[in-house]
Amino acid sequence: MKNYIEIVDVYARQILDSRCNPTVEVEVELEDGTVGVAAVPSGASTGAFEAVELRDGDKSKYLGKGVLKAVDNVNTIIADELVGMNVLDQVAIDKTMIELDGTDNKAKLGANAMLGVSLACAKAAANFLGMSLYQYIGGVNAKVLPVPMMNIINGGKHADNNVDLQEFMIMPAGAPSFSEALRMCSEVYHALKSTLKSQGYDTGVGDEGGFAPNLKSNEEAIIVIIEAIKKAGYTPGKDIFIALDPASSEIFEDGKYNLAGEGRVLTPEEMANYYVELAEKYPIISIEDGMAEEDWDGWKILTEKIGKKVQLVGDDLFVTNTERLAKGIKLGVANSILIKLNQIGTLTETLNAIEMAERAGYTAVVSHRSGETEDTTIADLVVAVNAGQIKTGAPARSERVAKYNQLLRIEEELNDMGEYRGLKAFYNINK
């Protein structure tokens, strides 16, 4: 088998994501005609320390959100350097782009430009070798199907309602397989829709396919989800668990947390106690961004209070960045990292963050963004690294369902070799 195959063309274009905003798509062609294509996602609530998503800023086109500058960077600066390189050397490709950019946060070329190229190269390499992407990235031991962390009620920046916390999710950790987990979530989703309708609530959906009703409180969202779980014939806390993403950086003002929908302003200590109360009342298995990205003291309080029994995921806190993750590990805050490819900008750096987390006993949850495309890379990535958990929205809206359908295909391909770990995926807590 050849271990060297040249890149002969790198080409980017502007396409639309699921939120009707432009994003970058990249094609990489090899000397034998093999092609790899990747599209880049985009977030609505973004961490302050994420790599830069390069936008044009021309208000007369796409309200300033065009990505033609990033596209041009791919078609000129990046292409000029990568053409002739070996597509099978992912580390060298990503290192070359990082050096070309020369900034700490990808501000020159744009993380959206670099990620599109990085992923398209990996896909082209996998296609050339005749391998599935998860096998190419993960090797012979890539086999773990993830527990879905499925967003079924949206609030915060993902919806136009009065719910402060951004995401209320279900996790079918009691399922025997991924396909059964997906079925369970689908049935709960339908049960939730009928439950909301019966209580007079709107069943319009948010960016990620979850319902976005004007509930009376954040706690009511949990209560109505538990009703739906039971209505679908499952047991909360045994078959299906609750996960939250408050996106607390979005409600952090002057050192306190503003739950405007409930008319409450809480100190970090009070916010931690708020989560403690919720975790004692309901089967909550995971809380993402429970504290703001720079509230390290609040994170420490929260971790000390419930970090042994609830997965505490750092998203804005860590932004898939090994430097921030290393700080968190040293301080003993959180016990899990959310992995978003476009927060850091290359596949290599993403894999480094996952490896660092797992070595420290932290779990890694591979995630979509609110602005998605039909690209299914994260489905392959989560299996490649045996992460065991994926967050990619409700079982509705085709850009979300595309990832779940790809996981069904992977499960089928792995057959008896595939493994669904369920509760064992939460090795960072006592469950």
Curated annotation (Swiss-Prot):
One of its GO terms (biological process) is glycolytic process. The keyword Cell cycle does not apply. It comes from the Bacteria. The keyword Plastid does not apply. Gene3D superfamilies: Enolase-like C-terminal domain, Enolase-like, N-terminal domain. It is found in: Cytoplasm; Secreted; Cell surface. SMART domains: Enolase_C, Enolase_N. Its cofactor is Mg(2+). (2R)-2-phosphoglycerate binds at Q166, K340, R369, S370, K391. Belongs to the enolase family. Pathway: Carbohydrate degradation; glycolysis; pyruvate from D-glyceraldehyde 3-phosphate: step 4/5. Mg(2+) binds at D245, E288, D315. One of its GO terms (molecular function) is phosphopyruvate hydratase activity. It catalyses: (2R)-2-phosphoglycerate = phosphoenolpyruvate + H2O. Keywords: Cytoplasm, Glycolysis, Lyase, Magnesium, Metal-binding, Secreted. Catalyzes the reversible conversion of 2-phosphoglycerate (2-PG) into phosphoenolpyruvate (PEP). It is essential for the degradation of carbohydrates via glycolysis. Its EC number is 4.2.1.11. This is Enolase. It is an enzyme of class 4 (lyase).
